[in-house]
C-alpha cells in the first residue's frame, strides 16, 4: 500500500510552568526561537532562527544561516493565550511533504498557584506515520523540546 496515509496514535506531552497562561503562550509563540533547539531543523544549512507567525494562516518555519527559509507548516488556530494549532508538513525523512496531514496542538491551562499546564498533542496523519511517531516520541523529540520550553519560561 505505497503512499497510503496512516493515522498513528497521537504523541502527547505535558509540562507545568510557573507562569500565567499569557506568559506561557508568549514564550511558546513569540519567543519560539529562544527555546527551540537549533539542531532540530530541516534545511541544508544550519538554522539561524525559528519563527511562528502570530495569526491564523501564518507560517511556522526556519530561517537558515545561508538566507534560505524552510516552511514546517501553517498556523491553523491562533487563540491567545489558550491554544495554538500548527499544521505539520514534515515526513519521517524530515523533508517537506504536502501530503502529510499532521497537526500539533498546544493548550495553555491555568491551574492554582500561578501554574499553567501546557499540553501538546502531535496528531500524525501520513504514509510514514508509525515511523514519524517513533521519532517525535523519542527522548530527543517532543520530550526534550518541551523541557527546553519549560526552562525558557522559567528563565
What label would you give each PLM region?
Residues 1-47:
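Hydrophobic ligand-binding cavity/cleft-lining segments
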Residues 22, 54-55, 61-63, 74, ...:
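Charge-dense, helix-prone N-terminal extensions
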Residues 24-28, 60, 75, 86, ...:
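Hydrophobic pocket/interface hotspot
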Residues 29-33, 80, 147:
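Solvent-exposed alpha-helix faces
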Residues 31-70:
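Short beta-edge strand/loop motif at the mouth of beta-sheet-based domains
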Residues 35-36, 78, 88, 131, ...:
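Tryptophan-centric aromatic hotspots in well-structured domains and transmembrane helices
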Residues 50-51, 56, 65-113, 123:
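Hydrophobic-ligand binding "helix-grip"
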Residues 124-155:
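A conserved amphipathic terminal alpha-helix motif
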Amino acid at each position: 500500500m505505497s503512499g497510503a496515509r496512516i493515522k498513528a496514535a497521537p504523541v502527547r506531552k505535558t509540562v507545568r510552568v510557573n507562569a500565567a497562561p499569557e506568559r506561557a503562550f508568549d514564550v511558546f509563540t513569540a519567543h519560539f526561537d529562544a527555546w527551540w533547539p537549533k539542531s532540530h531543523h530541516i534545511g541544508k544549512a544550519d538554522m539561524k532562527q525559528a519563527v511562528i507567525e502570530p495569526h491564523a494562516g501564518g507560517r511556522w518555519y526556519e530561517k537558515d544561516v545561508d538566507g534560505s527559509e524552510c516552511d514546517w507548516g501553517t498556523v491553523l488556530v491562533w487563540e491567545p493565550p489558550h491554544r495554538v494549532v500548527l499544521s505539520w508538513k514534515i515526513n519521517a525523512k524530515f523533508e517537506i511533504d504536502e501530503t502529510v496531514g499532521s497537526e500539533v496542538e498546544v493548550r495553555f491551562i491555568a491551574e492554582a498557584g500561578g501554574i499553567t499546564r501546557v499540553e501538546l498533542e502531535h496528531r500524525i496523519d501520513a504514509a510514514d506515520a508509525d515511523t514519524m511517531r517513533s521519532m517525535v516520541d523519542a527522548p530527543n523529540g517532543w520530550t526534550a523540546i518541551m523541557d527546553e520550553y519549560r526552562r525558557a519560561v522559567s528563565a
